[in-house]
């Protein structure tokens, strides 16, 4: 399991490819270690197996986000979504590795709990997205525009706009259309032209 950085990737994504490479290397080492030390009993240790599955799933989601960003032409408006997705996935992957280290038994487990956790704290895979990053990614999908349609492409959008999700999306569209008027009113209030 390795993550190679493709040639000519966007400079904003290089660090994510590098961190995913570290993550994949760590995952490969820990899987081999588990197969060697735990062997057939790995199935019995369901929680440990679940942590391995969590780490792999979060790495897969991060690489999928990177691949989609590249495939769709590196659109600048998608960058906040990509950064949020990768930071979140890498933080969750790190959380899974911490769980693996803490629950590995025997003398090897003791080494992993000390050196492994120290290594993860010195050279973390990721931290949860900052509030600024969360706000930027949320802002990108708060308009019912082409980007929203592209990001949600392939998802079920009901035709009937009278109830449920269809009604909610209609309200979302109307709110987006009313945004310029709201901005004018807010500007007039700031200039004290309106109460």
Segments predicted by a language model, with ranges:
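Flavin-dependent oxidoreductase catalytic core characteristic
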Residues: 1-195
